[in-house]
């Protein structure tokens, strides 16, 4: 069973519908015990990292996520669900995040043009990730849908699975062991978004049982 975390994120219903469309067996929950025992975890998100962190902390989920990821539970973070994984964010003033992935959430550069980036843009899949199970059926250069003003400036270059150009070549997908996170919205990204979600479901089902 995939636990889709409900902390009040506005895109939760769309993420749930998209996962159900690709056949995922899921539960919508804000219960740390359910999240801890889930076969896989999805953290959706829109809005600001500070608000998201406050909600996760209030629900007792902020302490659980590092545990389940360290235990090898397949995890997918979406948009702000990706950003809160980092060490800190500069959005509305510096503040700490979950510190699961080393790095800082920074504002897209003014040279990008209109901020936030809203609309379709391409995934440039890194060569060493081109055969990863999450990218099955997703070509290099696939168009996906973004809505964001901030990006993840990660320290570990080796976990960057795809980049997207918008004033800067920012990480649009990161993968480390059984952790994956995407800056774009797969639930709004048409066939390629659904394919990525289906790939995540298959990837999580293929994961070895946790000991």
Curated annotation (Swiss-Prot):
Summary of subunit composition and partner proteins: Heterodimer of HisH and HisF.
Purpose of the protein: IGPS catalyzes the conversion of PRFAR and glutamine to IGP, AICAR and glutamate. The HisH subunit catalyzes the hydrolysis of glutamine to glutamate and ammonia as part of the synthesis of IGP and AICAR. The resulting ammonia molecule is channeled to the active site of HisF.
GO MF annotation, one: glutaminase activity
Pathway noted in the entry: Amino-acid biosynthesis; L-histidine biosynthesis; L-histidine from 5-phospho-alpha-D-ribose 1-diphosphate: step 5/9
Name of protein: Imidazole glycerol phosphate synthase subunit HisH
GO biological process terms, semicolon-separated: L-histidine biosynthetic process
Primary location recorded for the protein, binned into one broad class: cytoplasm
Gene source species: Chloroflexus aggregans (strain MD-66 / DSM 9485)
Domain Glutamine amidotransferase type-1, residue spans: 1-210
Keywords: Amino-acid biosynthesis, Cytoplasm, Glutamine amidotransferase, Histidine biosynthesis, Hydrolase, Lyase
């Amino acid at each position: 069973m995939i636990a889709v975390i409900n902390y009040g994120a506005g895109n939760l219903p769309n993420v749930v519908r998209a996962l159900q469309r690709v056949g995922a067996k899921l539960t919508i929950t804000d219960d740390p015990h359910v999240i801890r025992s889930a076969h896989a975890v999805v953290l959706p998100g829109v809005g600001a990292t500070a608000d998201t962190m406050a909600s996760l902390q209030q629900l007792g989920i902020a302490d659980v996520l590092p545990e389940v990821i360290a235990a090898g539970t397949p995890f997918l973070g979406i948009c702000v669900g990706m950003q809160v994984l980092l060490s800190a964010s500069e959005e509305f003033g510096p503040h700490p995040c979950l510190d699961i992935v080393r790095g800082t959430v920074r504002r897209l550069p003014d040279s990008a043009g209109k901020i936030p980036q809203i609309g379709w843009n391409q995934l440039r899949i890194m060569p060493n990730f081109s055969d990863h199970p999450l990218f099955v059926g997703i070509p290099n250069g696939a168009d996906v849908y973004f809505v964001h003003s901030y990006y993840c400036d990660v320290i570990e270059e080796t976990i960057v699975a795809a980049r997207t150009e918008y004033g800067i070549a920012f990480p649009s997908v990161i993968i480390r062991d059984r952790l994956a996170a995407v800056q774009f919205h797969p639930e709004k990204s048409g066939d390629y978004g659904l394919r990525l979600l289906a790939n995540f479901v298959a990837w999580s089902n293929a994961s070895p049982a946790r000991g």
